[in-house]
């Protein structure tokens, strides 16, 4: 009987987290401005493509929204289903998946970086700042957001498991690594061809676009 009730709780966490993740401010901003974020720029419904298509302010808004929606999903799962041991982890991971594969957008969403950060924030603000610092260091060292994102999808669950001893929870938190890696395979192909926009695009837009144009 307990197994059946736990199964329903898990399914509720998955559904709740997934639907919250499906909320896409990047798509809504694009629609308001007259473009489809799924087919424009880098064809990604996330903060980085919003920067490319709508500017830094819009991109920052999208990043913050995506972070906080994942944090809210985790907290909601923990509050509504306190008897389920891994409620916040399951809800948070489901939110990341919903963000990446939103049913309302034909399963063409973002790449999960900001939402992953929101899950970290739900665990601890201090750990969020630490993971953010590591992500920034990796990003600047590699000059590619894709490398930073995929790296953090591994570093975060390993850190969680190491510091808490809760490796079952860490295993749940590691689930997004697979879809995040798959989502970034084309980025890695472009990196190998020298066609991927570098992180320096954020402050050297014209220079970076010229480089891509020349290499194309």
Q: Residue locations for each model-derived region?
A:
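N-terminal signal-anchor transmembrane alpha helix
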Residues: 8-33
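Nucleotide and nucleotide-moiety/phosphate-recognizing core
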Residues: 9, 13, 58-64, 68-103, ...
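Transmembrane alpha-helical segments that form the membrane-embedded catalytic/substrate-channel core
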Residues: 19-25, 93-103, 178-188
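Transmembrane helix boundary and interhelical junction motifs in multipass membrane proteins
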Residues: 22-28, 72, 108-114, 130, ...
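Cytosolic, membrane-interface loops and tails of multi-pass inner-membrane proteins
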Residues: 27-57, 189-216
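Short, non-helical or kinked segments that cap or interrupt transmembrane helices
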Residues: 36-47, 104-117, 144-152
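Interfacial segments of multi-pass membrane proteins
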Residues: 51-55, 77-80, 94, 98, ...
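Loop-to-transmembrane alpha-helix initiation sites
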Residues: 129, 145-152, 164-179
């Amino acid at each position: 009987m307990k197994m059946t009730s736990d199964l329903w709780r898990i399914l509720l966490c998955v559904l709740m987290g997934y639907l919250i993740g499906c909320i896409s401010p990047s798509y809504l901003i694009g629609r308001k401005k007259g473009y489809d974020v799924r087919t424009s720029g880098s064809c990604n419904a996330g903060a980085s493509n919003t920067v490319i298509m709508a500017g830094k302010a819009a991109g920052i808004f999208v990043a913050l929204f995506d972070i906080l929606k994942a944090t809210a999903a985790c907290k909601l799962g923990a509050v509504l289903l306190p008897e389920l041991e891994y409620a916040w982890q399951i809800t948070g991971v489901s939110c990341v998946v919903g963000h990446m594969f939103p049913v309302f957008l034909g399963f063409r969403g973002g790449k999960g970086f900001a939402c992953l950060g929101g899950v970290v924030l739900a665990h601890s603000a201090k750990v969020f700042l630490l993971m953010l610092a590591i992500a920034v260091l990796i990003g600047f060292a590699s000059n590619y957001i894709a490398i930073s994102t995929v790296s953090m999808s591994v570093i975060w669950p390993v850190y969680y498991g190491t510091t808490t001893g809760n490796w079952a929870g860490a295993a749940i938190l590691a689930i997004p690594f697979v879809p995040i890696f798959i989502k970034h395979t084309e980025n890695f192909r472009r990196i190998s061809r020298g066609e991927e926009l570098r992180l320096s695009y954020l402050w050297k837009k014209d220079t970076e676009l010229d480089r891509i144009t020349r290499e194309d």
